[in-house]
Amino acid sequence: FNGAVXIW
């Protein structure tokens, strides 16, 4: 996903 890690 893209939110806390900006890459997941």
From Swiss-Prot:
Its main location: secreted. Expressed by the venom gland. Keywords: Secreted, Toxin. The keyword Cytoplasm does not apply. GO terms for cellular component: extracellular region. It comes from the Eukaryota. GO terms for molecular function: toxin activity. It is found in: Secreted. This is Toxin To29. It comes from Tityus obscurus (Amazonian scorpion).
